């Protein structure tokens, strides 16, 4: 009997999902992206070679795996071609192993232009988007004016639809945002030049997945961003534009929710966040700077520095609740080496003085919230690259066990370095 496992970020993204997906991929036949776009960078280091994937599932580096892009993903044709080119230049046959839903909305140049114009207009109050047109593309999907992959099958109708939607965008860009318009002919020519390549990879993703499940094949769903950035359940409005939670698998890949066997939540041993928004445990002192330096906390796609703080069990409880997380994979454990003490946030102190163990839903309700910490002894030993749990310091064991206790979720996998071999699998998600 095959297993279907969801791998998703349980914090604010950048938890190390790419490595873990790559690690587990040798157990599966299919790896599926179901939400987001090319705004998420999944960094893989294999035999010392670094690969950053933004759109194509991380399983593409395994020859026996078929990669699927579900309807919940917003697809940038130019980003797809660039990523395919980079992989094919290294001898990886992408076109025979990548299948794309025809229902994927297309990210077009006017989406990117609108993204930049809006962020510029917001000034200091900007959301902190990656500027890749993700949000505007999802807006078009909901407004039912968006272009989809399926529209490329009829090039004349595509050209007419493009003209209408581009007129709509250019009016806003020029009249309201005082920005430059997007050129129609160049936009059309650019997408038509690569349309047939994309259409050659179109498939019915939902049916493929249903057939795979019935055939007993293992399937891995690769989430992007993190649960606390979910458009509905994250720290709104400082969120992404898609459903980053496990429910996104059903809506974004056409896979029945009862068929999900295991949800693996990826967590760092501490917390990070990119861009604006609430971050209760954020550190503004030398400790925060040291975590950022040791963890090399800069965005894989944007290069932006990440905000760093102690592990937040309160925020994680919300992620557990919304995603039915079965087990954790804790990454970057080695970054905490050398600290005299480590802390876990176990409660939030509200402005009223009340201490609660749950996270607010909207950003405004986080205002004035203070962390309530438990302090634990740190460890001086070097844990980088350790692959035997019994060889970890006792203080590490205590830290991991305490996180399991305060969250109620077991740590199934521990990561002590960026390479796939620098990992301890304590519970295999595909054998549970």
From Swiss-Prot:
Q: Give the protein's cofactors.
A: Mg(2+)
Q: What is its main location?
A: cytoplasm
Question: Binding of substrate: at which residues?
Answer: 300-306
SMART domains referenced in this protein's UniProt entry, alphabetically:
Adenylsucc_synt
- Record: residues binding GTP: 13-19, 41-43, 306, 332-334, 415-417
Q: What is its EC number?
A: 6.3.4.4
Involved pathway(s): Purine metabolism; AMP biosynthesis via de novo pathway; AMP from IMP: step 1/2
Alphabetical GO biological process terms: 'de novo' AMP biosynthetic process; IMP metabolic process
Which family, according to UniProt?
Answer: Belongs to the adenylosuccinate synthetase family.
**Record organism:** Actinobacillus succinogenes (strain ATCC 55618 / DSM 22257 / CCUG 43843 / 130Z)
**Subunit annotation:** Homodimer.
Instruction: Identify the domain of life.
Output: Bacteria
What is the name listed in the Swiss-Prot or TrEMBL entry for this protein? Adenylosuccinate synthetase
GO CC entries: cytoplasm
InterPro entries (UniProt xref) = Adenylosuccin_syn_GTP-bd, Adenylosuccin_syn_Lys_AS, Adenylosuccinate_synth_dom1, Adenylosuccinate_synth_dom2, Adenylosuccinate_synth_dom3, Adenylosuccinate_synthetase, P-loop_NTPase
Q: Where does IMP bind?
A: 14-17, 39-42, 130, 144, 225, 240, 304
Enumerate the UniProt keywords alphabetically: Cytoplasm, GTP-binding, Ligase, Magnesium, Metal-binding, Nucleotide-binding, Purine biosynthesis
Question: Which reaction equation describes what this protein catalyses?
Answer: IMP + L-aspartate + GTP = N(6)-(1,2-dicarboxyethyl)-AMP + GDP + phosphate + 2 H(+)
Question: Gene of origin?
Answer: purA
Report whether Magnesium shows up as a keyword of the record.
yes
Q: What does this protein do?
A: Plays an important role in the de novo pathway of purine nucleotide biosynthesis. Catalyzes the first committed step in the biosynthesis of AMP from IMP.
- Which residues are Mg(2+)-binding? 14, 41
Q: How is the cofactor bound?
A: Binds 1 Mg(2+) ion per subunit.
């Amino acid at each position: 009997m095959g297993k279907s496992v969801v791998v998703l970020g349980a914090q604010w993204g950048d938890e190390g999902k790419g490595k873990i997906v790559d690690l587990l991929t040798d157990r599966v036949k299919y790896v599926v992206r179901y939400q987001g776009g090319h705004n998420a960078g999944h960094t893989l280091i294999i035999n010392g070679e670094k690969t950053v994937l933004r759109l194509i599932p991380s399983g593409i580096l395994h020859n026996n795996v078929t990669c699927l892009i579900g309807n919940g993903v917003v697809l940038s044709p130019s980003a797809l071609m660039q990523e395919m080119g980079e992989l094919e230049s290294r001898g990886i046959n992408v076109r025979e192993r990548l299948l794309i839903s025809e229902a994927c909305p297309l990210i077009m140049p006017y989406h990117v232009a609108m993204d930049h114009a809006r962020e510029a207009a917001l000034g200091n109050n900007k959301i902190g988007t990656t500027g890749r047109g993700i949000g505007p593309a999802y807006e078009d999907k909901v407004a039912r004016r968006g272009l989809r992959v399926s529209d490329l099958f009829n090039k004349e109708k595509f050209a007419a639809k493009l003209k209408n939607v581009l007129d709509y965008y250019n009016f806003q860009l020029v009249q309201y945002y005082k920005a430059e318009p997007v050129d129609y002919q160049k936009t059309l020519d650019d997408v038509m030049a690569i349309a047939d390549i994309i259409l050659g990879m179109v498939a019915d993703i939902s049916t493929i997945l249903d057939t795979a499940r019935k055939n007993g094949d293992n399937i891995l769903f690769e989430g992007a961003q993190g649960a606390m950035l979910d458009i509905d359940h994250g720290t709104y409005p400082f969120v992404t534009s898609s459903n980053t939670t496990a429910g996104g698998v059903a809506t974004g890949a056409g896979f029945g929710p009862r068929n999900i066997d295991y949800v693996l939540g990826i967590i760092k041993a501490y917390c990070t966040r990119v861009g604006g928004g609430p971050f209760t445990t954020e550190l503004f002192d030398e400790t925060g700077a040291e975590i950022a330096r040791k963890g090399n906390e800069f965005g894989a796609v944007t290069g932006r520095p990440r905000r760093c703080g102690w592990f937040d069990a309160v925020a994680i409880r919300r992620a557990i609740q919304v995603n039915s997380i079965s087990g954790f994979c804790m990454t970057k454990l080695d970054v905490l080496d050398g600290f005299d003490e480590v802390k876990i946030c176990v409660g939030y102190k509200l402005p009223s003085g009340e201490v609660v163990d749950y996270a607010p839903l909207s950003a405004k309700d986080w205002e004035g919230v203070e962390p309530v910490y438990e302090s634990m002894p740190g460890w001086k030993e070097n844990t980088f690259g350790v692959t035997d749990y019994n060889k970890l310091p006792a203080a590490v064991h205590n830290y991991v066990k305490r996180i399991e206790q305060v969250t109620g979720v077991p740590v199934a996998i521990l990561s002590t370095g960026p390479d796939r071999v620098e990992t301890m699998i304590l519970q295999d998600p595909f054998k549970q």
